[in-house]
Amino acid sequence: MAAEEKDPLSFFAAYGSSSSDSDSSDEEKEAEKTKNRATKRPFPTETKKLPGPDELFRSVSRPAFLYNPLNKQIDWESRVKRAPEEPPKEFKVWKTNAVPPPESYQVAEKKAPPPELDMAIKWSNVYQDNGDDAPHANQAKCLPEEEAQEDSPPSDDEQENATKKHKV
């Protein structure tokens, strides 16, 4: 693959140079490079681990902040810094606009229209079509017949006011 790679400047080489001469010189150069790489490796193939703290301080003097005349061993656990513990968080229910599960559905009951309401009566009232053929609602009787007869009929003034309001 490396032999197949050509020098990008070979296009500008002299007219009479042959490609076989350049191939052999490329191979020689690559062989020299690999030899130089092999001899230039200063690192050994085995990697050494870093020494532990106790082993390190045997060969190096201890810093003053670690000196404890009573205890010759270093208490590394007391030197460790830990993050403060956070209290457990309370669970809060999220407020969402998501659709609730089907078990929690409650069918909203709609009120039925009153039984005496009839669309023919409603439209008749809207257009004030109160002719003979106009539908009339059944008058509900709240009072017993005896008490209804005792009530006096409305006076003439009340009837005039009612007709004026109705003729608007």
UniProtKB/Swiss-Prot annotation:
Domain of life: Eukaryota
Protein name: UPF0690 protein C1orf52 homolog B
Annotated family: Belongs to the UPF0690 family.
Disordered: annotated segments: 1-56, 124-168
Source organism of the structure: Xenopus laevis
Basic and acidic residues bias: start-end ranges: 46-56
InterPro entries listed in its UniProt record: DUF4660
Composition-biased stretches (Acidic residues): 145-160
Stored Pfam families: DUF4660 (PF15559)
